[in-house]
Amino acid sequence: ACMLGGVAAWLRWRKKRQAQGKPFDKPNFVISTGFQVVWEKFAQLWQIEMREVPLTLEKTTLDPEEALKMCDENTICIVPIQGVTWTGLNDDVEALDKALDAYNAKTGYDIPIHVDAASGGFILPFLYPEKKWDFRLKWVLSISVSGHKFGLVYPGLGWVCWKGKEYLPEEMSFSVNYLGANITQVGLNFSRPAAQILGQYYQFIRLGFQGYKEVQYNSLQIAKYIHSEIAKMVPFVNYSEDVVNPLFIWYLKPEYAKSAKWTLYDLQDKLSQHGWMVPAYTLPSKLEDYVVMRVVVRQGFSRDMADMLLGDINNAIAELEKLEYPTPTRMAQEKNLPVEAKMFNHGGRRKTVKK
């Protein structure tokens, strides 16, 4: 879905450049360093430069002014994210749209916005209907969202919507008549299962707007509860005080980490032994020294399960704090060496993953 939105922006830009008799061989797009890997794939596969706006502890979401500094006549779009994979936060699309409107008026460009709402797209309409991040904004021309995240459908289903048919280039539509009728399709692959689409359609009909609202509200409340309990634990500090989506991250307090004999990779290892998949990872560039852990709360994760998770975290901390010597991951961190985190698969066998 992200790739289709990106390709459409690229083709629209290329067509305009061709009509103006201008070069069209150096396209670029602007996104924060909190991007999901699909955008890196898009950049490499279509040979489009990806200009990254760094995230910092002071600026935890995309800074509109910094994004505009990276734009030029070759910019095909700016990509704000709703539900950043790394942090769970939302970029301020309304502020970006306002700043971009002034920028486009000043420069004569017509740089659009593609919203990557992979996670937040199925949260915002139900829990924050007043928030403007969608087609109510002037420069938002396309939105992508994952049905298999908070859309409550099994993998892998993605949706992309355009503000109007005129923003979907004709070159992206392909028709065939050898299947018994004229069939037109927009996509990167032609043959694919319809099970996920049927699953999404079923959920829409079965749950309706109110049903989705209740499911997402419950997930968010559970996430906020875990967030508040994590904040009470001595070793940890939450990355953000806000929980706007049912996912958030935390890290070790710097003063605690200095004397700790363990790392969050060790906590991940301990929790995996109890069946919890709570990943530890480093943040993107400019923040790569921070190792964080992330919790994602989905439908069916109850308050009882949250208490079980919190209990296992507390028990794991108690075990780790009894260590007499530093763990291998702690020693590796001190020597600035690659960290080898331990993971358990369903067969009970341990495997090593380099971080």
Regions found by a protein language model. Name each.
Residues 7, 209-355:
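Non-catalytic terminal extensions of PLP-dependent enzymes
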Residues 52-58, 106-117, 175-176, 187, ...:
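A generic structural motif
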Residues 1-174, 179-182, 195:
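Conserved PLP-enzyme active-site core in the AAT-like
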Residues 126-246, 250-256:
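Active-site C-terminal subdomain of aminotransferase-like
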Residues 13, 17, 50, 100, ...:
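Structural signal for hydrophobic packing residues in well-ordered secondary-structure cores
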Residues 1, 31, 35, 188-192, ...:
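Secondary-structure capping and boundary motifs in well-ordered enzyme cores
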Residues 3-10, 40, 94-97, 197-204, ...:
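Predominant activation on well-ordered alpha-helical scaffold segments within soluble catalytic domains
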